[in-house]
Amino acid sequence: MKFLFDLFPVILFFITYKVYGIYNATAVAIIATFVQIGWVWLRHRKVDNMLWVSLAIIVVFGGATLIFQDETFIKWKPTVLYWLFAAVLFLANQIFEKNLIRVMMKDQIRLPEPVWPRLNASWAVFFSVMGIINLYVAYNYSTDTWVNFKLFGFMGLMFAFVILQAILLGKYVEKSDDQEI
C-alpha cells in the first residue's frame, strides 16, 4: 500500500497527462505532492526528508515548466532526483563514512560488513544510470513515450533491480538466532 501511496503523484501525473496534456499534468503533480506531504504530516507528524526533496524538485522543475511553458524542465525532474539520490549515497559514504543504504535497511536485513559498501555503491550507480536513461528517453522519443516510460519503464527497472539485488544478496543474508534453517 505504501508503494502505491509513494507513486500517488506519478500516477495522477500520468492520468492527467493522458486526458489534459503535459502542463495540466505538471500542475497536478505539484499539487499531489503537497497533498501527499500534508497527509503524511497529519498521520505521522513527521515527513521523510526524501519527500521534502521530491517536493522541492517538483516545485522548481514543475514551476519552470508552467512558467516558461516548456516541457523540457519537467522531463529533467526525474534525472535531477535520481542524480541527487546517487550523489547523497556516494558522498555520505565517502565523506561522512555513513552508509545510508545500511541505515535504511539494517532492521530489515542482516548482511556481513563488507557487503554493505557494495550494496550502497550499486544503488548509487543504479540511480545514476536511471538519470541517464531518463534523459535518453526524454530527448530521443515523444513526450507521450516519455510519460509512459516514466511510470511503467522506471517502475519495471526498479522492480528488476530490487529482484536482482535480492538474488545477489541471498547468499550473504545472515540468519538471526530465532530463524529456522
Curated annotation (Swiss-Prot):
As for subcellular location, the record says: Cell inner membrane
Does the keyword field hold Transmembrane helix? yes
Provide the membrane topology annotation. Multi-pass membrane protein
- Top-level taxon: Bacteria
Instruction: Report TM segments.
Output: 24-44, 49-69, 72-92, 119-139, 149-169
InterPro entries in alphabetical order: YciB (IPR006008)
The encoding gene: yciB
Name the protein family: Belongs to the YciB family.
What is the documented function of this protein? Plays a role in cell envelope biogenesis, maintenance of cell envelope integrity and membrane homeostasis.
* Keyword vocabulary terms for this entry: Cell inner membrane, Cell membrane, Membrane, Transmembrane, Transmembrane helix
A cellular component term from Gene Ontology for this protein is: plasma membrane
Protein's name in the database: Inner membrane-spanning protein YciB
Q: Which PANTHER family match?
A: INNER MEMBRANE-SPANNING PROTEIN YCIB, INTRACELLULAR SEPTATION PROTEIN A-RELATED
